Amino acid sequence: VHLTDAEKALVTGLWGKVKPDELGGEALGRLLGVYPWTQRFFDSFGDLSSASALMSNAKVKAHGKKVLDSFSEGLKHLDNLKGTFASLSELHCDKLHVDPENFKLLGNMLVLVMAHHLGKDFTPAAQAAYQKVVAGVATALAHKYH
C-alpha cells in the first residue's frame, strides 16, 4: 500500500491509542451482526443471535483481539503487506474458505469502530489513510485466492 510519510505518521500515531482487546471484539461483533452470513465461519463461538450476545461473547472478543494483533503486525510492514499476511491468506483461502470480500467488510468495520472510539482524533485525513491501509490488508489477505 502506498502511503505518504504524513499518512504513515497518522496511522502509526493513532494506532498507539487503539486498544486491540476492546476494538477488535467490537469490530468483529459488528461484522457478525451487520453481515450475519459471516457467522457461518464461527460455528464454535456459541450464541451469536443478537447484538448484545455478539458484543458480550468472549470468543468474539478473543478472536477480534487476535485479528487486531495481526493487523498491528501488518502496520510494521506497510511496504510488504502481501508477505506479512501470506500465511494468513493461505489459511483463510485453503483451509477456512473465507470469502475474501469479508476482509473488506471487516476493514470497514474497523475504521468505523476506530472513528467511534477515537472521536476528534480520527480526522478525515486519518480516515483516508486508514481506508488505504485496510484496503491494502484486504488485498494482501485475498492474495492466495485463485
Curated annotation (Swiss-Prot):
Similarity annotation: Belongs to the globin family.
Phosphothreonine PTM sites in chain numbering: T12
User: Where N-acetylvaline occurs along the chain?
Assistant: V1
- Molecular function (Gene Ontology), one example: metal ion binding
**Where would you find the membrane-spanning parts of this chain?**
none
GO CC, any one term: blood microparticle
Q: What is the recorded name of this protein?
A: Hemoglobin subunit beta
PANTHER family, per the entry:
HEMOGLOBIN FAMILY MEMBER, HEMOGLOBIN SUBUNIT BETA
Q: Which GO terms describe its biological process?
A: hydrogen peroxide catabolic process
Q: Which residues bind heme b?
A: H63, H92
Question: Where in this chain does the record put each Globin domain?
Answer: 2-146
Q: What is the lineage of its organism?
A: Eukaryota, Metazoa, Chordata, Craniata, Vertebrata
